C-alpha cells in the first residue's frame, strides 16, 4: 500500500514539479544579471566606444560583463570611478546617462577639463583627462550604487538624511530641478524614468544653468524629451553670456527665475539641485528660501 501511495504521489507531484521548474527558469531568464552586486566592490569595465560630442565633451561607453547584464543602478543613484593617476588613487562620482533598460553597456557623458584652460585650475581635471587618454579596450574600476536618493516611481522619492539613516518617503506631484553644467546628468536620469512611464503623472520643471549656449550639455536629449512630453516636462535655460536672439534667461540663477520656472511652493514640490557648490550655496538655497520653498523639500545631489 505504501509503495502504491509513493507511486501515486510521484505521478501527481511530477507535473507540479515540472511546472514549478519551468516557472523558475522563466523567472530567472526574465531577471537580468546585475553588474553592481556589491557597493563595496570595484568592478573593472572595459571601454568599447568613445564619441566626441563637442570640443570638451565625450560620451564613453563601457561594456558590462555580458550582453545580458544591466548595471543595476537605482534611479537617483550614482557610481564612483577610481583610477591610479600619477601614482595617486583618484576617485570621482558620475551619473550614467544610460539606464537599466540598456543591457550590456553603460554610458557616461563627461566634460573634459583640459589643463591650461581655466586660470584657477591650471592642471585641469585629473579623472576627466584620464578618461580622455583611455584607449578602446582599456579598463577602469566602477563602484556603486551610491547616493542618498532613490526615485521609486509615480512621484515617490526615498531620501536618507545621511548614510546611516533610514529613508524618508516623499511623494509629490511636481519636481523642481536646478542643474549647473555637468550637474544635469542626475536630473536627466530622473526625468527619463518619469517620462518613460505613461502612468507616472509627475511634472518636472528644469532650470538649467551654463556659462554659454555651447556649454549646454545633453541639449538634444533634453529638448527631445520636452517635445515628446510637453505637458509633463518644462525646460528653461540660463547662461552667463547670452548670444543674440537668445530666447531664455541670462545670468546666475536668481529669485525671479525660480519663481517663474519652478513649481510654486503651494504645490509642495520636491526641489532637486546639482551643480558647483557655490551655485547651490549662494544662488539656489537663498533664492529658494525667498520664494518659500522649505529646506526639508530641497535636496542637493
From Swiss-Prot:
<keyword id="KW-0519">Myristate</keyword>
<feature type="binding site">
    <location>
        <position position="127"/>
    </location>
    <ligand>
        <name>FAD</name>
    </ligand>
</feature>
<dbReference type="GO" id="GO:0005789">
    <property type="term" value="C:endoplasmic reticulum membrane"/>
</dbReference>
<protein>
    <recommendedName>
        <fullName>NADH-cytochrome b5 reductase 3</fullName>
        <ecNumber>1.6.2.2</ecNumber>
    </recommendedName>
</protein>
<feature type="binding site">
    <location>
        <position position="126"/>
    </location>
    <ligand>
        <name>FAD</name>
    </ligand>
</feature>
<feature type="lipid moiety-binding region" description="N-myristoyl glycine">
    <location>
        <position position="2"/>
    </location>
</feature>
<dbReference type="InterPro" id="IPR017938">
    <property type="entry name" value="Riboflavin_synthase-like_b-brl"/>
</dbReference>
<keyword id="KW-0472">Membrane</keyword>
<keyword id="KW-0274">FAD</keyword>
<feature type="binding site">
    <location>
        <position position="109"/>
    </location>
    <ligand>
        <name>FAD</name>
    </ligand>
</feature>
<keyword id="KW-0752">Steroid biosynthesis</keyword>
<dbReference type="GO" id="GO:0071949">
    <property type="term" value="F:FAD binding"/>
</dbReference>
<dbReference type="InterPro" id="IPR008333">
    <property type="entry name" value="Cbr1-like_FAD-bd_dom"/>
</dbReference>
<keyword id="KW-0597">Phosphoprotein</keyword>
<dbReference type="Pfam" id="PF00175">
    <property type="entry name" value="NAD_binding_1"/>
</dbReference>
<keyword id="KW-1000">Mitochondrion outer membrane</keyword>
<feature type="binding site">
    <location>
        <position position="128"/>
    </location>
    <ligand>
        <name>FAD</name>
    </ligand>
</feature>
<keyword id="KW-0756">Sterol biosynthesis</keyword>
<keyword id="KW-0753">Steroid metabolism</keyword>
<feature type="binding site">
    <location>
        <position position="185"/>
    </location>
    <ligand>
        <name>FAD</name>
    </ligand>
</feature>
<comment type="subunit">
    <text>Component of a complex composed of cytochrome b5, NADH-cytochrome b5 reductase (CYB5R3) and MTARC2. Interacts with MTLN; the interaction is required to maintain cellular lipid composition and leads to stimulation of mitochondrial respiratory complex I activity.</text>
</comment>
<dbReference type="InterPro" id="IPR039261">
    <property type="entry name" value="FNR_nucleotide-bd"/>
</dbReference>
<dbReference type="GO" id="GO:0004128">
    <property type="term" value="F:cytochrome-b5 reductase activity, acting on NAD(P)H"/>
</dbReference>
<keyword id="KW-0152">Cholesterol biosynthesis</keyword>
<keyword id="KW-0560">Oxidoreductase</keyword>
<keyword id="KW-0443">Lipid metabolism</keyword>
<dbReference type="InterPro" id="IPR001433">
    <property type="entry name" value="OxRdtase_FAD/NAD-bd"/>
</dbReference>
<keyword id="KW-1207">Sterol metabolism</keyword>
<dbReference type="GO" id="GO:0005741">
    <property type="term" value="C:mitochondrial outer membrane"/>
</dbReference>
<dbReference type="Pfam" id="PF00970">
    <property type="entry name" value="FAD_binding_6"/>
</dbReference>
<feature type="modified residue" description="N6-acetyllysine">
    <location>
        <position position="120"/>
    </location>
</feature>
<dbReference type="GO" id="GO:0005739">
    <property type="term" value="C:mitochondrion"/>
</dbReference>
<keyword id="KW-0153">Cholesterol metabolism</keyword>
<keyword id="KW-0496">Mitochondrion</keyword>
<comment type="function">
    <text>Catalyzes the reduction of two molecules of cytochrome b5 using NADH as the electron donor.</text>
</comment>
<dbReference type="InterPro" id="IPR017927">
    <property type="entry name" value="FAD-bd_FR_type"/>
</dbReference>
<feature type="binding site">
    <location>
        <position position="92"/>
    </location>
    <ligand>
        <name>FAD</name>
    </ligand>
</feature>
<dbReference type="GO" id="GO:0006695">
    <property type="term" value="P:cholesterol biosynthetic process"/>
</dbReference>
<feature type="domain" description="FAD-binding FR-type">
    <location>
        <begin position="40"/>
        <end position="152"/>
    </location>
</feature>
<keyword id="KW-0285">Flavoprotein</keyword>
<feature type="modified residue" description="N6-acetyllysine">
    <location>
        <position position="50"/>
    </location>
</feature>
<feature type="binding site">
    <location>
        <position position="93"/>
    </location>
    <ligand>
        <name>FAD</name>
    </ligand>
</feature>
Amino acid at each position: 500500500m505504501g509503495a502504491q501511495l509513493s507511486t501515486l504521489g510521484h505521478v501527481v507531484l511530477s507535473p507540479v514539479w515540472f511546472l514549478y521548474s519551468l516557472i523558475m527558469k522563466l523567472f530567472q531568464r526574465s531577471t537580468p544579471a546585475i553588474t553592481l552586486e556589491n557597493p563595496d566592490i570595484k568592478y573593472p569595465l572595459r571601454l568599447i566606444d568613445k564619441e566626441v560630442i563637442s570640443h570638451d565633451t565625450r560620451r564613453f561607453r563601457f561594456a558590462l560583463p555580458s550582453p545580458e547584464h544591466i548595471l543595476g543602478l537605482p534611479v537617483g543613484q550614482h557610481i564612483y570611478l577610481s583610477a591610479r593617476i600619477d601614482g595617486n588613487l583618484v576617485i570621482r562620482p558620475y551619473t550614467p546617462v544610460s539606464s537599466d533598460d540598456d543591457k550590456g553597456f553603460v554610458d557616461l557623458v563627461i566634460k573634459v577639463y583640459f589643463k591650461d584652460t581655466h586660470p584657477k585650475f591650471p592642471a585641469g581635471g585629473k579623472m576627466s583627462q584620464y578618461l580622455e587618454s583611455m584607449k578602446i579596450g582599456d579598463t577602469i574600476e566602477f563602484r556603486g550604487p551610491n547616493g542618498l536618493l532613490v526615485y521609486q516611481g509615480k512621484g515617490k522619492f526615498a531620501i536618507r538624511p545621511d548614510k546611516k539613516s533610514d529613508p524618508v518617503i516623499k511623494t509629490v506631484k511636481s519636481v523642481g530641478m536646478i542643474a549647473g553644467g555637468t550637474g544635469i546628468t542626475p536630473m536627466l536620469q530622473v526625468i527619463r524614468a518619469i517620462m518613460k512611464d505613461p502612468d507616472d503623472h509627475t511634472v518636472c520643471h528644469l532650470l538649467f544653468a551654463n556659462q554659454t549656449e555651447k556649454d549646454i550639455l545633453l541639449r538634444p536629449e533634453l529638448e527631445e524629451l520636452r517635445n515628446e512630453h510637453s505637458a509633463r516636462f518644462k525646460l528653461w535655460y540660463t547662461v552667463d553670456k547670452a548670444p543674440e536672439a537668445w530666447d531664455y534667461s541670462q545670468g546666475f540663477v536668481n529669485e525671479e527665475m525660480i519663481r517663474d520656472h519652478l513649481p510654486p511652493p503651494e504645490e509642495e514640490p520636491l526641489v532637486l539641485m546639482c551643480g558647483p557648490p557655490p551655485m547651490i550655496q549662494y544662488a539656489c538655497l537663498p533664492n529658494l528660501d525667498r520664494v518659500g520653498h522649505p529646506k526639508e523639500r530641497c535636496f542637493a545631489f
